[in-house]
Structure formats: structure tokens, C-alpha cells
């Protein structure tokens, strides 16, 4: 009796295996070789390629060393918080590696002089200033399908105005039109983005929901589709000013990783964005160095390997700017201590409630 039941189980296993092989061959005949495969059959799972953001702290907070290629990224925040600056830094870093980048300027507000100061190679940057949202997204689709673009920036989702709205009267009510446009475009784009390994960065603005009694009234434009399709969502805020005596020379900026499908989310990092320069790399080296114990702080003095960097943060920044070899040594030490620093980011700001009251989303799916 036991032998009969054992034989029956073996026969069922053989039948299932044959049925699976038949199904796989049928799928490959219908849709082509490679349309379905066993994930670990032939080769190891390839690590995700990333592009640095221009901020060492943010690269560490993202957990994979930068923003991932072949994925959709959303950067949102209030006005003048550094959204476009962060996107342009990413473009500059991609170009340094020989990548081809494109910028869809739906806001018609890109400053080429500022972009050059951030390190963007304007001669090799493709730029489009479309008239309608449909035109902008068709251009994006064509560029992504070409497989030749490494980083594509759309600035911004709020400026992707549907054609019906442009052709209509000023007072016309067209509810949900932009959300439907974004939803359809993302359905088309998502497979092409993965195949072409193109990183698509959508810059987004914040709006207020009317009549919200509990929770944050803030929301992003363009509906909910982008929130779901994005692998990484960054909430960027201006939290203060950087002053040289009485003159304001930059912004203190906080970035929260609200969603991250590649590493634990809710990490918070702070850095300075200097006017005309972009992200202050030397400022980050000082701050992260103190966090990791690489740079020693005694009172107002900062020192590294018993060498004094300066009294006060600004003097330490100036020393590192004038001594690039020391700055390089500190950066190397920080990259080796990346795991320790990432834990500190989570300790400092990683509660799921979000200190800005913005609705957070768990990233690991």
C-alpha cells in the first residue's frame, strides 16, 4: 500500500515536470527565447548599476551607492529646495562616466550657466522644451526605447500640461486629466526603462489637499501612479541658511529617502547647497567624518590624524578645499565606514512617522 502511494507521488512529480517543460516551450515559441527563464539557471544575479548623486551622504543613505539605473526616481519638495540641483548633479556624475543624458524641461526654466557650474557638460546634454504633456512624454518614450540614454530628467511633473487643457478656456474644469496622462505614460514606459537600463528622474512639486483635518495636507501632483512605479522617492527640504557673516551664501538641506525598493528606507541626510556651486562636498566630509569618528571634534576645533583642520566648521571646509589630498583620504575612510554611517542616518531621522508630517511609504517590496 505504501509502495503504491509512493509510486503515485513520483508519477505526479514527473507529470508536473513534463507539463512545466511543455508550458515553457510553448511560451518561448509564442513570445521568443528569453521571455521566461529560471532566475539563477545560467548566470549569477547581476548587481544593480548606480549613478552617484553628487552627495556622498545621500549615496550612503540610499544603501546601494547612488540612484539605480533602469528604474524610475521621484524627487519632490517645496520651491527652491534643491530638486533640480540634485538632478543636475546626477546628470553630471553620469556624464563623467561617459553616459549620455537628456533633460526634458517642461517648466522652460533650466539655467545653462548654473548647470555648467555644477559640472554638467552642456555640449553633450540633450534638451527638449515641449509644448504639451503628451509631447513631453512621447519624447521620453522615444529616448528610452532608443536604449542610448543613461539618465533622463523630467522637470517637472506639475508642468506636464495636457493638450486639452492648453486648447481649452482658462476656467475649464478637467478633473483627473493629468493623473490619467501620467498613469498611461508610466504603464508604457516602465518595461522600456527596465530593458534599456535608463534611469528616469521625475521632479515633482507639492500641493495642499483642502479640508484635511488629520495628518499632513501635503501631496504631490500627477496622481498616485508615480508613487507606485518609482523605485526611489526623495523628499528634499530647505531647513536653514548658510551665512558668511550677514550674507546668505547657501541653503542647509535635508533629504529623506521616503521609499526605497533596493535598501531600507526612511534614512535622513543633511548637507549644504551653496549658491553657484551646488552640494558642498567639503561640508559633507566634515559632518560625515565626525559621525563616523574619522574626523575628531574637540570644542570648536576639527582635526584628522592629529592634523588640525580648523576652528569652526567653515574653516575646516576651507582647509579641505585647499588640501584635496586630505579630503580624498577622508572620503576613502568614509566609504569604508559606509555601513556605520547609514545606521546613524536611520537613528537620526528614520522613524516612519516622518518629521515633516509627509505620508511615508515602506519601500522594500
Curated annotation (Swiss-Prot):
Which Pfam families did the record assign?
RecA, RecA_C
Q: Which GO terms describe its cellular component?
A: cytosol
Q: Which InterPro entries match?
A: AAA+_ATPase, DNA_recomb/repair_RecA, DNA_recomb/repair_RecA_CS, P-loop_NTPase, RecA-like_C, RecA-like_N, RecA_ATP-bd, RecA_C_sf
Record key words, sorted: ATP-binding, Cytoplasm, DNA damage, DNA recombination, DNA repair, DNA-binding, Nucleotide-binding, SOS response
Q: Which CDD domains does the record match to this protein?
A: RecA
Record-annotated residues binding ATP? 77-84
Concerning HAMAP family, the annotation shows: RecA (MF_00268)
User: What is the role of this chain?
Assistant: Can catalyze the hydrolysis of ATP in the presence of single-stranded DNA, the ATP-dependent uptake of single-stranded DNA by duplex DNA, and the ATP-dependent hybridization of homologous single-stranded DNAs. It interacts with LexA causing its activation and leading to its autocatalytic cleavage.
Q: Which family does it belong to?
A: Belongs to the RecA family.
* Cross-referenced PANTHER family: MITOCHONDRIAL DNA REPAIR PROTEIN RECA HOMOLOG-RELATED, RECA
Name of the protein in its database record: Protein RecA
Q: Which organism is it from?
A: Mesorhizobium japonicum (strain LMG 29417 / CECT 9101 / MAFF 303099) (Mesorhizobium loti (strain MAFF 303099))
What's the gene?
recA
